[in-house]
């Protein structure tokens, strides 16, 4: 189920995004990015609709995933 992220408290949304970013592991790119930069990137992707915030009833967890990978 897609969670309407705009309806979440901003602090809750920030916590969910930070948790997601920290789970994603280490960047191996040329330049390391700060947590704040990564959070801003995910927030931008949510705003553009590129990614969605998803609740999994099976796993009882929240995840952020590309819109194209989400299946009802």
From Swiss-Prot:
It comes from the Bacteria. HAMAP family: UPF0270. Belongs to the UPF0270 family. This is UPF0270 protein ETA_31870. It comes from Erwinia tasmaniensis (strain DSM 17950 / CFBP 7177 / CIP 109463 / NCPPB 4357 / Et1/99).
């Amino acid at each position: 189920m897609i969670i309407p992220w705009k309806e979440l408290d901003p602090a809750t949304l920030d916590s969910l995004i930070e948790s997601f970013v920290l789970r994603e592991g280490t960047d191996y790119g040329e330049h390391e990015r700060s947590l704040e930069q990564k959070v801003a990137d995910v927030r931008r992707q949510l705003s553009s609709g590129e990614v969605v915030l998803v609740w999994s009833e099976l796993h009882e967890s929240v995840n952020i995933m590309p819109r194209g990978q989400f299946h009802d």
